[in-house]
UniProtKB/Swiss-Prot annotation:
Lineage, broadest ranks: Eukaryota, Metazoa, Ecdysozoa, Nematoda, Chromadorea
A GO MF term: calcium ion binding
InterPro entries per UniProt: EF-hand-dom_pair (IPR011992), EF_Hand_1_Ca_BS (IPR018247), EF_hand_dom (IPR002048), MICU1/2/3 (IPR039800)
Record-given protein name: Calcium uptake protein 1 homolog, mitochondrial
Key word Transcription present: no
Region called Disordered, residue ranges: 131-150
Domain notes: The EF-hand domains have high affinity for calcium and act as sensors of calcium levels.
Amino acid sequence: MLHCSFLRVIPIKNASKRLIIVRSLTSAPAKTSEAEKQQDSLKNIDAGEKYTALGNIRQKKDVFHYTDRASGVGYSHYSSSVYQHRPYIWPPLRKLYHWNYALVIAGMVILMSDFEWLKDQIKSASLPFRPEASQKEEVTESNGEVEEVKEKPKKKKLGFRERRIIEYEDRLRLYSTPDKIFRYFATLKIIDPNEDSGRFEVFMTPEDFLRSFTPGVMQPRRWGLDSFKNYNPEKHKRHKFSDPDSIFYKLGENGLINFSDYLFLMTLLSTSHADFALAFKIFDVDGNGALDKEEFTKVQQLIMSQTTVGQRHRDHITPNQSFRVETNSALETYFFGKDGKGSLSSEKFIEFQERLQHDILKMEFERRDALDNPDGLINEDSFAQLLLLHAQINEKKQKHMLKRVKRRFKGENLKGISFGETKAFFEFLYHIDDVDIALHFHKMAGMSIDAKLLQRVAVKVTGIPLSDHVVDVVITLFDDNLDGKLSHEEMVAVMRRRMRRGLERPRDTGLFRLFDAVLECGKRAYHASPLPFY
């Protein structure tokens, strides 16, 4: 019985084996193809990375795979806390994954592009296709006379890049040393033809000199720190300040300014006439009312040591000879002759200082005139901006003051201000200390300062008549409560800073002065204390 049962079991097992083999044969091609795909995908993978820690074949990772399951079959990297919180990527965007490189490259190209240059190129290329009437002067003939009508230039809006550059240059004017300011704003160099070493001397034009201390005016794009162009006599001999009446013509050929003259001209602009007159009297040993070259050098050194420009000059550490103070500068040649044996009177020197201030004011006026309308007049808003140029008033309050002038002078009230009226008012400001005393006495007497009183004080104190229109603009600019009366305390403070052109300000951020003050207070407390510090 047992033998028979054994024989019966064997066929059953053989039949099951045959069934399993048949099933495996039918499914063998599919498994073989899947295995081949896995093998092909794992060919380029390191042998140690083909399998997981549990011996399973490592599946190919998909960077865009996403699942919300925290655990379970098919979940990988479940031990990582970052994997659960990774950002979800919208499936249509996953197909655009490779376009990210193109977007990054396009963004870098946009950031490095010079749109101003591109705009100028497009404008110059499209110029022949524009109507001639909008670009050229309109010529109208009436009664045999030809009249030219010029289009008013539009004010160019400053972009983000220009505003950042202007802010940097304003900080440079305030806190840098004179030699660095000169190196940044000077644009000309003259190479010495007698030397093969390529040594050169750097010069400023009158426009460069004005730009070096005028805030808000950007240096030309091509020129910057230690970037100069070669001097061309044919080009610069027709300079508009090369006429004999200009003070810059007296400084040398074609009105060029070297570093020594730059330092002393900045000192002239930041020092009053009374200080120079007193210095002349002190160093006039002979008592003849004039100074020789040696005595004038002492006056020059004394005045420069009292100004922020002279105090910040670092002549002892300047490596280039072009930025050292020379003894035979163009100023000394003009004052004492080529041999240096002449004499300089205080009257001649004060006249030179007044002429310098006149030429600087003329350049400032012509720059405003070119922005408004080149007809010899500037509008009231530009005149107000000219007065507030070095006012050191916060931007919000300054905009409020200028807006008051714009509202008052528009339409029929917009008459314009000539250079003669501007010059007369600035000559009135040269006596601002005497004007302050006179206005203070009138206020103590209970008199309100209106337009008529200001004109009367100008004539009595300075002998300079002021036009009604200019006085109206000034009162509107400083009339905070809109009652038609002048707030003379603020006006006097602003005008004093305006006449010094911001050159009296300390050329540092105040941090070192704070440390010096703390150290000085500590020393005084140490010496004044009766108790020992131990």
